[in-house]
């Protein structure tokens, strides 16, 4: 799996950063691409990357602020002509996302040549697709804003060859059945496959947050995550200023990393008050402290393997 950032600025774009957009490549578990938020200009950003809109099967919107959705109508329209013809799309987001898209399409007389399935979240959501489980939980941003916990499929445990030989089953095609089925038959007897396999291993867990001030659901979403994508609109100054505007300060994110046992954190949605030089200087200062957890400030077009 791989996460790619097409926009990392908060509120407004800058000369160096677009507004929010994240792509999650599901390979090797699936050939699909999932997008999280579609800020203005996202489709133009994607033109600079190998990702194709035709491979985008799902779009997850965290909340309805413009810097997270203003690029959606244009991207949906362009998908019709960039390999998305007749390929269904699932659009998940807060209440109102369906009305926003349909009104935009109607007023602009745009016609999509593929079906969209809308899933509007109320308080929380559990969604299953291609072995993936996605949980959405409500955050604290003044308007409905959600964080998504994406759990990849489990990897089947290793076959216990000696145990199979003990029942007279030698290596061969039957082993694939043991690996991929709940039960198998040998010499007229039915066996439980789990008795001949090691423990299954949970696939990668990715937590992707919408805008929020600290809240209890953050720990639910990010618990034991392999990768967490979190906003830190404010990366210096006084923490209360961030929280007054229902946003997170870098210190809030560091506390969450430690509480939730997050392995790697990618910080996005940086205020447009910070230029690249500012961000680099703040980063160097922060990592001098031995208590600072593992994190990166991300920039547009950064990609990270999971």
Curated annotation (Swiss-Prot):
It catalyses: Endonucleolytic cleavage of RNA, removing extra 3' nucleotides from tRNA precursor, generating 3' termini of tRNAs. A 3'-hydroxy group is left at the tRNA terminus and a 5'-phosphoryl group is left at the trailer molecule. Its EC number is 3.1.26.11. InterPro entries: RibonucZ/Hydroxyglut_hydro, RNase_Z/BN, tRNase_Z_dom. Belongs to the RNase Z family. Homodimer. GO terms for molecular function: 3'-tRNA processing endoribonuclease activity; zinc ion binding. It is an enzyme of class 3 (hydrolase). The keyword Lipid metabolism does not apply. Pfam families: Lactamase_B_4 (PF13691). The active site is at residue 67. Zn(2+) 1 binds at residues 63, 65, 141, 211. It comes from Staphylococcus aureus (strain bovine RF122 / ET3-1). Its cofactor is Zn(2+). Keywords: Endonuclease, Hydrolase, Metal-binding, Nuclease, tRNA processing, Zinc. The keyword Ubl conjugation does not apply. HAMAP family: RNase_Z_BN. This is Ribonuclease Z. Zn(2+) 2 binds at residues 67-68, 211, 269. SUPFAM superfamilies: Metallo-hydrolase/oxidoreductase. Zinc phosphodiesterase, which displays some tRNA 3'-processing endonuclease activity. Probably involved in tRNA maturation, by removing a 3'-trailer from precursor tRNA.
């Amino acid at each position: 799996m791989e996460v790619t950032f097409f926009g990392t600025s908060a509120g407004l774009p800058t000369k160096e950063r677009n507004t929010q957009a994240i792509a999650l490549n599901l390979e090797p578990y699936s050939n699909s691409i999932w997008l999280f938020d579609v800020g203005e200009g996202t489709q133009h950003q994607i033109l600079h990357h190998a990702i194709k809109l035709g491979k985008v099967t799902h779009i997850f919107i965290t909340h309805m602020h413009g810097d997270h959705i203003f690029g959606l109508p244009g991207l949906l329209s362009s998908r019709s002509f960039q390999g998305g013809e007749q390929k269904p799309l699932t659009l998940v987001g807060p209440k109102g996302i369906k009305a926003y898209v349909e009104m935009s399409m109607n007023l602009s007389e745009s016609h999509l040549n593929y079906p969209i399935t809308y899933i509007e979240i109320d308080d929380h959501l559990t969604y299953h697709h291609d072995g993936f489980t996605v949980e959405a939980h409500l955050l604290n941003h003044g308007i409905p804003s959600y964080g998504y916990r994406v759990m990849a499929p489990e990897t089947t445990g290793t076959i216990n060859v000696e145990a199979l030989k003990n029942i007279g089953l030698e290596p061969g095609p039957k082993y694939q059945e043991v690996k991929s089925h709940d039960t198998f038959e040998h010499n007229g007897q039915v066996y439980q496959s789990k008795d001949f396999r090691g423990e299954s291993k949970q696939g990668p867990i990715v937590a992707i947050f919408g805008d929020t001030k600290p809240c209890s659901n953050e720990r639910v979403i990010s618990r034991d995550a392999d990768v967490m994508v979190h906003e830190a609109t404010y990366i210096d100054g006084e923490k209360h200023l961030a929280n007054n505007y229902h946003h997170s300060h870098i210190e809030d994110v560091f506390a969450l990393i430690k509480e939730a046992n997050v392995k790697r954190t990618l910080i996005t949605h940086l205020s447009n008050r910070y230029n690249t030089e500012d961000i680099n200087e703040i980063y160097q200062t922060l990592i001098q402290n031995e208590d600072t957890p593992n994190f990166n400030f991300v920039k547009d077009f950064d990609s990270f393997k999971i």
